[in-house]
């Protein structure tokens, strides 16, 4: 699971207005496939790998920089991964398309809530936090949520094999 997160952090897909990684997709995927406890533990292991200096995060240098990188502008988003993984595994997604889509928007919001709070603390609340930390990613996030909504029930069925 943490290897999948690492790979998803390193692959950048051209998208408007900024390139997208598949990290948030994989975090939600892990929650749906593994359930809340295992997914949260998997994301926790991924974060620990980054904290000790392994180059697992998006844009982290080959040699990694551990705590220095972790406490940078993306720390809040990374912490939000834990909550997103937990709630993606906890909520019931065996419903209709619109409800699944709404629940996935809810679970991904933890990434942005924590990310924006940390960004505001780090760079100052007088800066355009939403324009820097949320708006550029909105279309890509909605695209990923749409894909996950379409395949959520199939992903959940993976739990029987894990």
Features from the language model and the residues they span:
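Structural signal for the C-terminal ends of transmembrane alpha-helices
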Residues: 33-37, 87-94, 154-159
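Mid-bilayer segments of alpha-helical transmembrane spans in multi-pass integral membrane proteins
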Residues: 52, 73-82, 86, 90, ...
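Interfacial aromatic-anchored transmembrane helix boundaries in multi-pass membrane proteins
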Residues: 9-19, 47-84
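Membrane-embedded alpha-helical hairpins and interfacial helices in multi-pass inner-membrane proteins
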Residues: 94-162
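Alpha-helical transmembrane segments and their lipid-water interface positions
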Residues: 42-46, 53-57, 84, 88, ...
């Amino acid at each position: 699971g943490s290897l999948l997160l690492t790979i998803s952090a390193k692959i950048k897909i051209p998208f408007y207005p900024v390139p997208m990684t598949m990290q948030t997709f994989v975090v939600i995927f892990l929650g749906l496939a593994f359930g809340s406890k295992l997914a949260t533990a998997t994301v926790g292991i991924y974060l620990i790998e980054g904290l000790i200096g392994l180059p697992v995060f998006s844009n982290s240098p080959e040699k990694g920089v551990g705590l220095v990188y972790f406490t940078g502008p993306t720390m809040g988003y990374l912490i939000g991964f834990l909550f997103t993984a937990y709630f993606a595994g906890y909520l019931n997604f065996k419903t209709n398309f619109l409800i699944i889509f709404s629940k996935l928007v809810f679970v991904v919001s933890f990434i942005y809530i924590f990310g924006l709070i940390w960004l505001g603390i780090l760079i100052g609340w007088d800066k355009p936090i939403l324009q820097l930390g949320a708006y550029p990613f909105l279309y890509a996030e909605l695209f990923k949520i749409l894909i996950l909504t379409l395949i959520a029930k199939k992903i959940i069925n993976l739990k029987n094999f894990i």
